[in-house]
Amino acid sequence: MRTKAGIATAAALSVIAIGALAPAGDAASGVCGSDSGSGGTGATGSGSSCDSGKYVNPFKHQSWYAGRIDMGVDYMPNHRYPVRAIGKAKILGSDSHSGWPGGHFLWYKLLRGDHKGDIIYVAETLKKLVPAGTKVAPGETIAKALPSGTGIEMGWANKRGETRAASCYSEGMKTHSGREMARFLNELGADVVSKAKSAPDYPTGPRC
């Protein structure tokens, strides 16, 4: 899915029922295919096409507010929800005493697909983080998101767990790295408040 296109702005914070967006996600190149219709993620277990390199919409069949784009992309759940791995992955780090709002920070490396080797972080108001070293399938739960505090943020990181834009970020900045994650998530079927059509859907180029 490593593609580029131009930026269109959307209105501010909007509530999203991710289940309604599922067809758009399923149609995107590289998205995990069949959905059981039972609130699952489309992952069908070991040996499936999902396990071999396709990706899932981590918010499918859930209701979230899409927030701002900064170092990553902010979301607020309307209920307690599982946070799901986008693809087959290895958890590189899991910290419940970080300096992030809410104190929680987890990062994982994708092991299959056209984003193989890319590292994704999930941070902020979480609980029950999966420990470092765990390997997970597409759509498998890696943490629980709580409908309180600052919600969660999802973006690109390096193997040490530093966000890609950390070295150049100032509070409230809409970074290139954040737009890249927004593009990737939107292609999977997740809503974003600003569709970054000119940004690539993977971590490359300017950090901020």
What are these model-predicted stretches?
Residues 27-106, 137-138, 178-208:
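Surface-exposed, glycine-biased beta-strand/turn segments
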Residues 152-170:
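Short, compositionally biased
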Residues 167-181:
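Polybasic, proline/glycine-rich intrinsically disordered low-complexity segments
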Residues 1-27:
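Secretory targeting and sorting signals
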Residues 86-129, 149-156:
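Zn2+-dependent peptidoglycan hydrolase active-site motif and core
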Residues 76-79, 84-85, 110-141, 145, ...:
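Short histidine-centered loop motifs in beta-beta connectors
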Residues 141, 148, 158-160:
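Internal hydrophobic scaffold segments of catalytic domains
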